[in-house]
Regions:
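C-terminal extensions of enzymes
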Residues: 1-18, 24-33, 40-41, 144-150, ...
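Non-catalytic, usually N-terminal nucleic-acid engagement modules in DNA/RNA processing proteins
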Residues: 1-184, 297-300
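Conserved, mostly hydrophobic/aromatic
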Residues: 22, 55, 90, 132, ...
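Hydrophobic alpha-helical packing residues
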Residues: 22, 163-170, 210, 239, ...
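A non-catalytic, amphipathic alpha-helix used as a structural packing/dimerization or gating element
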Residues: 127, 131, 158-169, 205, ...
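Glycine- and acidic
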Residues: 148-152, 157, 217-223, 332-335
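Glycine-rich phosphate/ribose-binding loops and adjacent secondary-structure elements
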Residues: 164, 173, 177-179, 185, ...
Length: 379
């Protein structure tokens, strides 16, 4: 892996990352395909058409449904889903702690019940790395605990210490797996995760600890889980400066276009969030003038595209009125078109961000973008 910062504009940075599955230009928004597909009937051909650089899939869900061992028999997730660009897999940790019925956290890992059939499953650092190795993703995430944002300082500190020990085990297991002859991707990369709730001291200490581990990248987890936007931005302000400047920084699970604009200004490279697809399936679409709800009656006779000048498949061919009709009729095409538009909007915004940073005009771009999106609601 080679990561090179091309341009800095204040704390915002535009970088180029070379991986075994292709080049990633940052800042980048990863399109979330939990089980190897974007919800809303979006194919990998669609993703290529709308400019997606990185797809993100979920280790936990792929493990409990189809099974990572089966996917390995197909040559890994890339071949299984016919995607030739980078894939990031999360560790499964967040789902273990938030979706499944937690039985017990031990030093070895976590035992829990599957949310599908109730069977007992054990997952620890080694198991998470083994599953992600079977999937053969470009980037694997370390197994961590995401403590509740309002947990006590002592609980957060104990959790972070355990996450650090788990990270060391993840690194050792990945090194072992990448040396095996039958490993799907022997150049799989490992990102560690910074935790610490909204406690400055713990965040900083943990960032300083994991930056010494010489990982391929560093994520900031445990945000967008109930804290205010101001708290999120503050944690980025105090944490990012303590992570290596020559490695990518990933803000997990974030977020809205406004969140992304603010986080880029604080040195973040990678983003992911389900908002574009989830909102699209419910008729909410993003524009440069704010978010629209196409279910609203005001669009019943609206012959305009979702956004004038947008190059997405929905805006090239269909009116707001027609898409509203599809949504009201519960036709899958309506959800698909809204999802494609939203993902295209995000991908295009990231391209504009990269260009603005490279031309050292990010402050002006951000101000202009925010002025449009934070104006009066458009319905």
């Amino acid at each position: 892996m080679k990561y090179e910062v091309l341009t800095k504009d204040g704390r915002a940075k535009s970088a180029r990352m070379e991986t075994v599955h292709g080049i990633i230009e940052t800042p980048v928004f990863m399109n979330v395909g939990t089980v190897g597909a974007i919800k809303g009937a979006v194919s990998t051909d669609d993703l290529r058409e709308i400019g997606t650089q990185v797809e993100l899939s979920n280790t936990y869900h792929l493990h409990v449904r189809t099974g990572d061992r089966l996917i390995k028999q197909f040559g890994g997730l890339h071949k299984f889903m016919n995607w030739d660009r980078p894939i990031l897999t999360d560790s499964g940790g967040f789902q273990v702690f938030s979706l499944a019925k937690l039985r017990r956290i031990r030093e070895e890992g976590v035992q829990f019940n599957s949310h599908i059939d109730g069977r007992k499953i054990f997952m620890g650092p080694e198991e998470s790395m083994q599953i992600q190795s079977n999937l053969g993703s470009t980037i694997a995430m370390a197994f961590d605990e995401c403590p509740p944002s309002r947990a006590s300082d002592q609980y957060i500190r104990d959790s972070v210490d355990r996450t650090t020990r788990w990270l060391l085990r993840c690194k050792e297991e990945m090194a072992r797996l990448n040396a095996l002859p039958d490993t799907v991707n022997r150049e799989q990369l490992l990102f560690g995760i910074n935790q610490g709730g909204v406690v400055d001291e713990i965040r900083i200490e943990h960032a300083r600890t994991i930056r010494e581990m010489n990982l391929d990248g560093y994520a900031i987890g445990g945000l967008a889980v109930g804290e205010s936007h101001e708290e999120m931005y503050h944690i980025l302000d105090v944490t990012v400066p303590h992570l290596p400047e020559d490695k990518p920084v990933y803000l997990m699970g974030v977020g809205t276009p406004v969140n992304i604009l603010e986080a880029v200004d604080r040195g973040v490279d990678f983003f992911d969030c389900v908002y574009p697809s989830r909102n699209g399936r419910h008729g909410y679409v993003y524009t440069n003038q704010g978010k629209l709800n196409l279910f609203n009656q005001q669009y019943e006779l609206d012959s305009r595209p979702i956004e004038e000048g947008c190059g997405c498949p929905a805006c090239r061919s269909y009116s707001r009125a027609y898409i509203r009709h599809l949504l009201k009729a519960k036709e899958m095409l309506g959800m698909r078109l809204c999802t494609l538009h939203n993902l295209y909007f995000y991908n295009t915004m990231m391209k504009e961000i990269r260009e603005a940073i490279r031309e050292r005009r990010y402050a002006g771009y951000k101000a202009s973008k925010l002025a449009g999106m934070e104006g009066p609601p458009k319905g």
